[in-house]
């Protein structure tokens, strides 16, 4: 029973991190979309640098979420 509870809690924590990462990256993209910025496609494939450069799926690391210069 404890193993199932532990797995459930770990999955919940993982989903929370994934959703927080999505929310962090969406705001600049919507702002750029409203301003007609054509770099929207580039900014969809990025991650914040507080992940210490451990970006997934070949994403680029940006210090300010998706809006800063690439690191």
Swiss-Prot record:
The keyword Disulfide bond applies. This is Delta-actitoxin-Avd2b 4. Keywords: Disulfide bond, Ion channel impairing toxin, Nematocyst, Neurotoxin, Secreted, Signal, Toxin, Voltage-gated sodium channel impairing toxin. Residues 1-20 form the signal peptide. One of its GO terms (cellular component) is nematocyst. Disulfide bonds join 46-61, 47-55, 49-66. Voltage-gated sodium channel (Nav) inhibitor. 1 uM completely inhibits insect voltage-gated sodium channel inactivation (DmNav1 from D.melanogaster). The keyword Membrane does not apply. It is found in: Secreted; Nematocyst. Coiled coil: none annotated. Its main location: secreted. Transmembrane segments: none annotated. One of its GO terms (molecular function) is sodium channel inhibitor activity. Residues 21-41 form a propeptide. Belongs to the sea anemone short toxin (type III) family. SUPFAM superfamilies: Neurotoxin III (ATX III).
